[in-house]
């Protein structure tokens, strides 16, 4: 079964001005007690485990001894499509349709790893396309150690993510096993489990013990893989637990619970954090079986945050490289399918499209088009030819730049236009995502697994621009810092167009963007892929000045909010709750919004 990619935008203003939500699904299940450890016998046993283990079982103990063996080569799981157990907790679109659905099992797994001290590093990070009907993989760096009771074997574990095919949902898990360079067999079974997700429509526990093979050999570019991992880890932002806010700022009166007061269903929060005064204060990463062992490596979806974090940043990079005339380029000169559109694209600019103000829509009623069959067809289309044609089915209703209508397809179209523009400048091999990653994000030491969905379920497909980035806690905080604190500069060099960035942050005197239709008397504004809410003493008397909060928002409950005091609040959740009011208030206690 090929499942449709469902992108259903939420009430986006809630992420800026107020909290809102939907009833939580009942995900409580009665299960036997989960083991708190996995022994040598457990990992060599052929028995199917009755329940998932506690997730802390996959973590390297604080008193662990150094590894006695080195893992380098390929790890293969043997016939994963016939192994494991699943408990489905929520399945809004019947992905788990029975008859051995591919969603009930892992898909084929074959990955190379290298070891650097106690770090186990996958040779390929980022999104790995498997061809499965259900899942692709993202595999992150893990750890290697020895402990008593393992009969001379070395123990390894690592985090992995099941990313739905043509979808931005993430289902996070861990794997662990024993291995040896001198014993036979050279590897135990692999114990795996998936017990957490950021996915509003599908929730499940998936676990098992599966036979595996370990093929040792020297992995190509192993020294570079190790060096890159060392560099990325060394350049992460300073990090502390959120609880440290009360000790770092003892006189502020900060109340930790208020940071997420906009969110009623706390069990549906994956993780959140507040970057302030140079420190990334982070929550944990709770699962249904305790704390996730690799919180800093956990892959988080972005959905429509991609419109800001990728599309808008790419546009500002092009503006810095080639001048502000990029913004007024016409879509029709770069996307030939526009000439066969049901609408009128003759005068639609890059700016109009990234502002979601092309004038081509069915209805200006708030979010009506997002729920239309036409948008569903566009969102579910996987191959580029179908997707780009489905993007142009909306008729013309208004002049470009006059009416804001939330449209995934417009963001996709401008992404293709920017890609074509870049290829005209740099050659046919240029790619807009690769340029954005290499020019903007790699220099700030973004995680190696930072990646995007592409069309055709293929690494050679086109980037989307409307959805699809996969990030970590550190990634979100770093991107907030780049935009909100560093003015688009990296190591003293201006990387993003500074004028457009200030306009995007609403720190220029003029008002930019269009009001978001349906957001009330104090509307949010949308400009350059970002939402912005205006705070005044009249509307928010706790503040004595006028200021704007700019936010990136994504389906399910993804928010990255940039506050004018230089702090960034981010959260990944999946109960369709959105808000940053609580975080804004607590951040204000530490560093006032109004000088």
What is each stretch, according to the model?
Residues 247-272, 340-446, 471-477, 481-485:
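Active-site-adjacent helix/loop patches that line small-molecule binding or acyl-intermediate pockets
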Residues 386-392, 398-407, 420-427, 450-564, ...:
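Penicillin-binding protein/beta-lactamase superfamily catalytic region
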Residues 16-19:
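C-terminal motif of bacterial Sec signal peptides marking the signal peptidase cleavage site
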Residues 27-180, 184-188:
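Long, solvent-exposed N-terminal ectodomains/accessory regions
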Residues 35-58, 62, 72, 321-361, ...:
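Active-site helix/loop module of the DD-peptidase/beta-lactamase fold
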Residues 101, 107-114, 127-130, 137-251, ...:
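Structured C-terminal helix/loop/strand segments within mature extracytoplasmic catalytic/sensor domains
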Residues 301-326, 414-418, 476-479, 483:
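Active-site SXXK
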Residues 250-294, 559-560, 568-570:
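A short, well-structured edge-of-sheet supersecondary motif
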């Amino acid at each position: 079964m090929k499942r449709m990619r469902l992108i259903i935008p939420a009430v986006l203003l809630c992420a800026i001005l107020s909290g809102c939500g939907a009833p939580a699904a009942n995900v409580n299940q009665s299960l036997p007690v989960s083991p708190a450890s996995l022994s040598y016998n457990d990992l060599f046993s052929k028995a199917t485990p009755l329940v998932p283990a506690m997730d802390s079982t996959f973590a390297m103990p604080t008193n662990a001894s150094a590894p006695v063996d080195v893992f380098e080569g390929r790890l293969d799981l043997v016939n994963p499509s016939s192994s494991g157990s699943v408990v489905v907790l929520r399945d809004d679109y019947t992905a788990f349709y029975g008859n051995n659905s591919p969603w009930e099992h892992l898909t084929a797994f074959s990955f190379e790893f290298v070891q650097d001290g106690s770090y186990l590093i996958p040779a390929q990070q980022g999104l790995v396309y498997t061809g499965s009907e259900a899942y692709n993989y993202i595999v992150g760096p893990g750890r290697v150690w020895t402990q008593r009771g393992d009969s001379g074997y070395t123990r390894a574990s690592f985090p992995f993510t099941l990313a739905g095919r043509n979808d931005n949902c993430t289902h996070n898990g861990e794997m662990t096993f024993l291995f040896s360079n001198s014993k036979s067999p050279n590897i135990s079974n692999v114990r795996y489990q998936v017990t957490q997700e950021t996915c509003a429509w599908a929730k499940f526990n998936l676990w098992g013990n599966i036979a595996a093979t370990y093929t040792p050999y020297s992995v190509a570019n192993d020294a570079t893989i190790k060096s890159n991992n060392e560099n990325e880890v060394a350049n992460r932002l300073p990090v502390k637990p959120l609880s440290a806010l009360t000790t770092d700022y003892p006189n502020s009166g900060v109340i930790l619970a208020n940071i997420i007061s906009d969110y009623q269903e706390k069990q549906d929060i994956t993780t959140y954090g507040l970057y302030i005064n140079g420190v990334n204060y982070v929550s944990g990463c709770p699962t249904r079986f305790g704390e996730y062992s690799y919180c800093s490596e956990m892959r988080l979806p972005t959905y429509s945050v991609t419109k800001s974090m990728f599309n808008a940043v790419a546009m500002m990079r092009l503006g810095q490289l080639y001048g502000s005339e990029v913004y007024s380029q016409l879509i029709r000169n770069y996307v030939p399918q526009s000439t066969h559109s049901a609408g009128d694209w003759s005068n639609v600019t890059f700016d109009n499209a990234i502002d979601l103000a092309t004038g081509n829509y069915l209805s200006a009623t708030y979010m009506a088009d997002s729920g239309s069959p036409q948008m569903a067809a566009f969102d579910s289309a996987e191959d580029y030819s179908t997707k780009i044609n489905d993007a142009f089915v909306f008729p013309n209703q208004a002049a470009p730049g006059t009416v804001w209508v939330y449209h995934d397809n417009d963001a996709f179209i401008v992404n293709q236009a920017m890609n074509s523009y870049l290829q005209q400048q740099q050659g046919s091999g240029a790619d807009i995502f690769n340029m954005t990653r290499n020019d903007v994000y790699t220099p700030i030491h973004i995680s190696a697994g930072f990646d995007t969905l592409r069309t055709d379920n293929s690494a050679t497909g086109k980037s989307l621009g409307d959805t699809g980035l996969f990030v970590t806690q550190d990634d979100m905080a770093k991107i907030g810092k780049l935009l909100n604190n560093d003015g688009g500069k990296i190591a003293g060099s201006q990387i993003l167009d500074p004028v457009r960035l200030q306009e995007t942050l609403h720190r220029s005197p003029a008002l930019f963007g269009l009001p978001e239709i349906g957001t009330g008397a104090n509307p949010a504004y949308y400009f350059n892929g970002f939402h912005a809410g205006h705070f005044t003493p009249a509307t928010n008397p706790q503040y004595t000045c006028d200021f704007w909060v700019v936010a990136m928002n994504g389906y399910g409950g993804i928010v990255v909010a940039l506050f004018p005091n230089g702090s960034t609040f981010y959260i990944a959740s999946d109960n369709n709750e959105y808000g940053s009011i609580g975080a804004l208030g607590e951040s204000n206690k530490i560093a006032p919004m109004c000088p």
